C-alpha cells in the first residue's frame, strides 16, 4: 500500500507500529502458545494468520467436528488466502461464522473472499458499518477487496453470549478505538480476542473518526481488566499478552 509507513501508525497504538517488521519477517501462519487452552484439556484449535500490509492478525477457531469461526478476516493478497485455504482444507474445517471486532479496512479486507466461499453469517456492531462501507476509498487492492455489498447479516447490538462447537463465547462491547468496537471472550479457555482495543504494551489509536480516548480507557479498565488476571489476550496486531501484564506494565494504566 502506498505510503504504508505513514498510514500504519494511524490505525493502532504505538506498540503496534512494530508489526510492519513482524509482517515482513513472516507472511505465514503462526502457531500460538495456547497454554491456557492446553492445560484445560479442551478440544479447541486456534490459529493466527498475520496478513496484509498492516500485519493484521486474523484468527481461526475450530472444534473437533470441523466447525470453524473466523475473527477479523484481513486476507488481502492471493498468497495469504491460498495459505489459509490450504490450512482449513487439510484440517477439514468449514467456516460457520465470521466475526469482526471492528470495521477498519485492515480487519475487513478479506470478508468478501470468505462470504463468497462459505456464504455464512457475518457479525459486526452496527456502529462500524459506515467504516466498512468506506473501504473503497483506500483505493488499489483494498478497494477491490471490499467491493459489493458486505453489510453484516448479524448486528452485535448488546453483549450477547453464544456457543461455538460446545464452547461458550461472550461478546464484550469496547467502544473507543471505534464506536462499534467489540472483543470476544472464551470463558472456559480464558482467552480474549481484543481486536484493536488492547495490545501488548499499548492501546488502539483514537484520533480517527469515531475514536474516543476516554471511552477506550474506560472500556479497557472497566470491562477487560475485570477479566481474570491470567486471561490470555490475542490482539489484532502484535504478540499475545495477559490481562495481568497489561494492568502492571501498560503505560496507559501503570
Regions found by a protein language model. Give the residues of each.
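Aromatic (phenylalanine/tyrosine) cluster motif
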Residues: 4, 20-23
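Cysteine-centered motifs
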Residues: 8, 16-19
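Short, positively charged and aromatic/hydrophobic N-terminal segments
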Residues: 23-24, 30
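Conserved beta-strand hairpin/beta-sheet module of binuclear metal-dependent hydrolase folds
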Residues: 39-91, 183-194
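Residue-level marker for buried hydrophobic side chains located in beta-strands
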Residues: 69-71, 99, 122, 193, ...
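Metallo-beta-lactamase
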Residues: 75-76, 93, 137-141, 161, ...
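Active-site HxH/HxHxD metal-binding segment of metal-dependent hydrolases
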Residues: 76-81, 85-164, 249-252
